[in-house]
Curated annotation (Swiss-Prot):
One of its GO terms (molecular function) is rRNA binding. This is Large ribosomal subunit protein uL15. Part of the 50S ribosomal subunit. It comes from the Bacteria. The gene is rplO. Binds to the 23S rRNA. It holds the Pfam family Ribosomal_L27A. It comes from Prochlorococcus marinus (strain SARG / CCMP1375 / SS120). GO terms for biological process: translation.
Length: 151
């Protein structure tokens, strides 16, 4: 067995393939048309065409309109309720998603509760929700109630 040294290292058989020299005569194997076929744009000099080029036809990426306002990827969804719909509840009661379902104000409690500030509140309530708008928070606290944020 021979010892391995840096000067004795060789690549495996067939690992280093020789580059084909195109257009160097028929005997070289890639002479004449160099493997590009007979005629056409792909056989001419200056090839290949750029990606997306459709031969002068208006390309797809220019035919399609530039659409704006794509939906957010990780958008949060909420069960929305306005402050005005809380007026029918008892004074001093605690309001959360479960209590709103029991009273029938919310019919499909699929997502966490978010309170919006449309309308006026005349009842003092303790509201527990995942999120509040700024106007909803001021109206609830203005009526003497409190806002508790939780997930």
């Amino acid at each position: 067995m021979t010892s391995i040294s840096l000067d004795s290292l060789k690549p495996n058989k067939g690992a280093r393939k020789r580059k084909t020299r195109k257009g160097r005569g028929i005997a070289a194997g890639q002479g004449a048309s160099c493997g590009f076929g007979m005629r056409g744009q792909k056989s001419r000099s200056g090839r290949p065409t750029r990606p997306g080029f459709e031969g002068g036809q208006m390309p797809l990426y220019r035919r399609v309109p530039k659409l704006k306002h794509f939906p957010l990827v990780n958008s949060k969804s909420f069960t929305l309720i306005n402050v005005a719909s809380l007026n029918s509840l008892k004074e001093g009661s605690t309001v959360n998603l479960d209590s709103l379902v029991k009273t029938g104000i919310v019919t499909s409690p699929k997502y966490p509760l978010k309170v919006l500030g449309n309308g006026n509140l005349k009842v003092k309530l303790v509201v527990q929700a995942a999120a509040f708008t700024a106007s909803a928070k001021t109206k609830i606290e203005g009526a003497g109630g409190s806002c508790e944020v939780f997930e």
